[in-house]
Amino acid sequence: MKYQLTALEARVIGCLLEKQVTTPEQYPLSANGVVTACNQKMNREPVMNLSESEVQEQLDNLVKRHYLRTVSGFGNRGTKYEQRFCNSEFGDLKLSAAEVALITTLLLRGAQTSGELRSRAARMYEFRDMAEVESTLEQLANREDGPFVVRLAREPGKRESRYMHLFSGEVEDPPAVTDMLNAVDGDLQARVEALEIEVAELKQRLDSLLAHLGD
């Protein structure tokens, strides 16, 4: 895929996308603002404790890759940063408000169910119902310039499948339920065969013993 982000780059871009919608009065963000956003505990998984230098390194890299741009002057005190990852004037990636909300939440929290995504993305976009969430996820998974989202195999004991963004490369699926059941079936079959052999050997020994007693 054209868009490849490290875990830290995904966190920085996710934070800028989030703040652009939820706190527009504070956007663009200063470097310190990005540090605070990256390390906040609410709506982050995993919770990070990045230093200013670590965040600054990510900001510099993303500016070089044209995913961010710096803003200065016109009343701004110091350099601030705004995202050019999507919906920028000359950028290729165009996303709807619903798509931005889901992508942002996935960038910030990793794999989640559609229900979790609807709840956690609510500050950015109010989905009418679960059908709209599922429809938007399907669109992201089937875009010609994507896919940007993948549905993961349902984990054992879980009622719902989770979704994950693909901006950090392919996602390794957890073992599917059917795969695990097949593995269990194979193990049971091997144990049954071993027991059958053991029973056959015991039967032979019993027959031999009875024959000996008969003599």
From Swiss-Prot:
The keyword Acetylation applies. The modification N6-acetyllysine is found at residue 80. The keyword Acetylation applies. InterPro entries: DUF480 (IPR007432), WH-like_DNA-bd_sf (IPR036388), WH_DNA-bd_sf (IPR036390). It comes from the Bacteria. Coiled coil: none annotated. Keywords: Acetylation. Gene3D superfamilies: Winged helix-like DNA-binding domain superfamily/Winged helix DNA-binding domain. Belongs to the UPF0502 family. This is UPF0502 protein YceH. The gene is yceH.
